[in-house]
Each structure stands twice: as structure tokens, then as C-alpha cells.
């Protein structure tokens, strides 16, 4: 258990000496000037934080983002919907009908196979009754030989 505390202390000590992450160009956010804050109540907070985060220009505070409802409406219209539509269960009968069709086709195929097997069994029985006999193939053996 002691190793966990030592590891945490080492991570904290190591993170103190690491440099801040470099700014990335992949984010399309405008960096706003803290002196131009829309809300007057945020002005005092921004000036006190500006010295603390001056070395990390990649850090954007949520207090800097404007809360303009017109801009939010434009954003929601440009994206298509204001909120995503929930996926409701479908009441379609297509899937159950397809399952019934498949089961019916399987049942018909089984019936045809059963009938084909029965026809083959009858043909095999006739062949075995007439093997080695001189009579006609279609006539039973008892008719040819009356002993």
C-alpha cells in the first residue's frame, strides 16, 4: 500500500517540472481578449486569472465564451437540429413477416425432402424385391412365382 503513495507523490512531483502543452492549431476557437468581457461581473475574475494562466495561451476559460442566444440559435440551425432525436422502437411488421416467410420456406423444403425420401424408399424396396428375378420390374415377386 505504501508503494501507491510513493507513486502518487512521484507523479505529482514530476508534473510540477513539466512544461505546459504547446498550442495546437486543430481547435477552431477564437482567443478572446479578457479586457473585452461581455459580462461585467466576470471582469474582476479574469484580471486575477490572467497572470496565473499567462504562460499557457492554449487554455481557454469558459468565462470568456459569450452567452449570446442569437449565436446559439444560429449554431443549432446550422447543425440541423437543436437536440438529437431519440431512437424509439419500431412498430413495423416487416421483420416478423420476414421471419415467418423464412420458416414457411424451411417447412416446405423439409416436406419436399420427406416426400422425396419416401419415393426413394419405395423405389429401393421394389428394386430389392426384384433383384435376381426374371420378372418385370414393376410387378411384385409373388405374382410371378406361385409356389
Swiss-Prot record:
Keywords: Amidation, Cleavage on pair of basic residues, Hormone, Secreted, Signal. Regulation of fluid secretion. PROSITE patterns: CRF (PS00511). GO terms for molecular function: diuretic hormone activity. The modification Valine amide is found at residue 131. Belongs to the sauvagine/corticotropin-releasing factor/urotensin I family. Residues 27-84, 135-147 form a propeptide. This is Diuretic hormone 45. GO terms for biological process: body fluid secretion. One of its GO terms (cellular component) is extracellular region. It is found in: Secreted. Residues 1-26 form the signal peptide. It comes from the Eukaryota.
